[in-house]
Amino acid sequence: MSRIAKYPVELPKGVEANIQQDQITVKGPLGTLSQALTGDVTVALDNGKLTFVAANESRHAGAMSGTVRALVANMVTGVSKGFERKLTLVGVGYRAQVQGDAVKLQLGFSHDIVHKLPAGVKAECPTQTEIVIKGSNKQVVGQVAAELRAYREPEPYKGKGVRYADERVVIKETKKK
């Protein structure tokens, strides 16, 4: 059995979980999220706690019980507190601004990049060189941040590009003659 699945997931105040045959739905103040369940994992709700047990003794069932527990724990956190990812733009003339449900980036190309945000994800720009992506689904928030970073990844000689706020870019030394 997975060591992660041993610990139950507690539902905070204002969060409800609904378990069907092959799906779990978590509803909270920041929205509703659903996750498909495999037949290898049995989920039970009692006294505001979700418990996860492998349905059989196979190695795959034990691994999946930990995976499902981690995904559901992220869902509970997402609908109660939410997730955010911060990006920083480093470079001369690099700017970002939010236009409705899209982020407009100026990253040194001959054209501006307009990245449309998926449903359930919001972005804000506290300054011209910072982007904060917020949402209830951790996977979607991380995916949007990765897509924005992919437009201009930090280059290793000057460090210019779009980077995560907590990312450290190792600067290489240039060639000497």
UniProtKB/Swiss-Prot annotation:
It comes from the Bacteria. This protein binds to the 23S rRNA, and is important in its secondary structure. It is located near the subunit interface in the base of the L7/L12 stalk, and near the tRNA binding site of the peptidyltransferase center. GO terms for molecular function: rRNA binding; structural constituent of ribosome. NCBIfam families: L6_bact. SUPFAM superfamilies: Ribosomal protein L6. The keyword RNA-binding applies. Part of the 50S ribosomal subunit. This is Large ribosomal subunit protein uL6. InterPro entries: Ribosomal_uL6-like (IPR000702), Ribosomal_uL6-like_a/b-dom_sf (IPR036789), Ribosomal_uL6_a/b-dom (IPR020040), Ribosomal_uL6_bac-type (IPR019906), Ribosomal_uL6_CS (IPR002358). Keywords: Ribonucleoprotein, Ribosomal protein, RNA-binding, rRNA-binding. It comes from Bordetella petrii (strain ATCC BAA-461 / DSM 12804 / CCUG 43448).
